[in-house]
Swiss-Prot record:
Its EC number is 2.8.1.6. It comes from Chlorobaculum parvum (strain DSM 263 / NCIMB 8327). Belongs to the radical SAM superfamily. Biotin synthase family. Keywords: 2Fe-2S, 4Fe-4S, Biotin biosynthesis, Iron, Iron-sulfur, Metal-binding, S-adenosyl-L-methionine, Transferase. Binds 1 [4Fe-4S] cluster. The cluster is coordinated with 3 cysteines and an exchangeable S-adenosyl-L-methionine. Catalyzes the conversion of dethiobiotin (DTB) to biotin by the insertion of a sulfur atom into dethiobiotin via a radical-based mechanism. One of its GO terms (molecular function) is 4 iron, 4 sulfur cluster binding. It catalyses: (4R,5S)-dethiobiotin + (sulfur carrier)-SH + 2 reduced [2Fe-2S]-[ferredoxin] + 2 S-adenosyl-L-methionine = (sulfur carrier)-H + biotin + 2 5'-deoxyadenosine + 2 L-methionine + 2 oxidized [2Fe-2S]-[ferredoxin]. One of its GO terms (biological process) is biotin biosynthetic process. Homodimer. This is Biotin synthase. The lineage of its organism: Bacteria, Pseudomonadati, Chlorobiota, Chlorobiia, Chlorobiales. The gene is bioB.
Length: 334
């Protein structure tokens, strides 16, 4: 090992050699690295990704979502345009009809998307309601009409009965994020519900055999060490997919004036996440195009092996053809 590497990065090379996650102690030390050392850390994270999480066919995991029910959410998430507690401008509509879901899913699938997520605003579903039954019908329709498409969902917090029904209807992944270090959820994200309600949902889903997609947001006011706390909380939950979002400040939300996190700090976060989760799918989600801009490829080399394409819930995404080209370019570094 070259003596020019920072000693903590040298120690972290054990992840590459063994496939074992970095320790919390070492991750915390890596979080304190100066910005001048970040590219060496990125290089290690890319090597770990290529060896232990190379992606589908050696490529990039890509998924798309549809905002199937928008706005008037009773939760007070500080980053979210859809909360009725915030004054952001956002489209408001109830659950769309299944034909609209099928049309959008088919269009995305024809462009090469393999995973499609149905997303709804609101707390979630403690019980199976008529609206929830409509969502189950959408899932069944997509399975019938697009059998090669993996159908996913993000419907908020769930009771046991709705979780069991999603398993019975063959959902591929369920997204529910813890967003930040659990100890700071109430302060940084929301206090109309607790992070424990999210964690309980994750455990219910896993008990029914559903793979969970769970990650967080960079830029809510958390420290680097608190980001690492979130990363290690995800280890304990043993989730399958980890989406990392970079905050896109939205006018009319409490975080509209949030200070941006530096590119090296974000890259460091992605790299540490990869070293803590050597074989997981780590997806770069919101903020890829609007915040990272010219540096989004750097995060794909800092350990990410997937991204959300085709747009987000209330912000626009990038052209899917451009994303296909990006995926091809990233693959050349494998």
């Amino acid at each position: 090992m070259s003596s020019r590497l920072h000693p903590d990065i040298e120690r972290a090379y054990r992840v590459l050699e063994t496939g074992e996650p970095v320790s919390l102690e070492l991750a915390s030390a890596l979080g304190r690295l100066p910005e001048s050392e970040v590219l060496d850390l990125v290089s290690l994270a890319n090597k770990v990704k290529n060896l232990y999480a190379p992606g589908e066919g050696g490529g990039v995991h890509a998924c798309s979502i549809m905002n199937a029910k928008s706005g008037v959410c009773g939760e007070n998430c500080r980053f979210c345009a859809q909360s009725k507690h915030n004054s952001a401008e956002v489209d408001v509509y109830g659950l769309v009809d299944e034909a609209k879901v099928l049309d959008q899913a088919r269009a995305l699938h024809e462009q090469g998307v393999g995973h499609f997520g149905i997303v709804t605003s609101g707390y979630g579903y403690r019980k199976v309601t008529p609206e929830f039954e409509r969502i189950l019908g959408m899932i069944d329709l997509l399975h019938r009409e697009l059998p090669d498409l993996k159908v996913c969902a993000s419907l908020g917090m769930l009771g046991d009965e709705p979780a069991a029904e999603l398993a019975r209807h063959g959902i591929a992944h369920y997204n529910i994020n813890i967003q930040v270090d659990p100890g700071r959820y109430g302060e940084l994200i929301a206090d109309t519900h607790s992070v424990d309600e999210r964690i309980d949902t994750i455990r219910r889903l896993r008990a029914h055999g559903i793979a969970v997609c769970c990650g967080g947001i960079i830029g809510t006011g958390e420290t680097m060490q608190e980001r690492i706390g979130m990363i290690f909380a995800l280890q304990k939950l043993d989730v399958t997919v980890i989406p990392l979002n970079v905050l896109v400040p939205i006018d009319g939300t409490p975080l509209e004036g949030a200070a941006p996190v530096s590119v090296p700090e974000i890259a460091k976060t992605f790299a540490i996440c990869r070293l803590a989760h050597p074989s997981k799918i780590i997806k770069f989600a919101a903020g890829r195009e609007t915040v990272m801009k010219d540096f989004q490829g750097l995060l794909m080399l800092a350990g990410a092996n997937g991204f959300l394409t085709g747009g987000y819930l209330t912000t626009r995404g990038r052209d899917m053809e451009a994303d296909r080209q990006l995926a091809g370019q990233i693959a050349r570094f494998s």
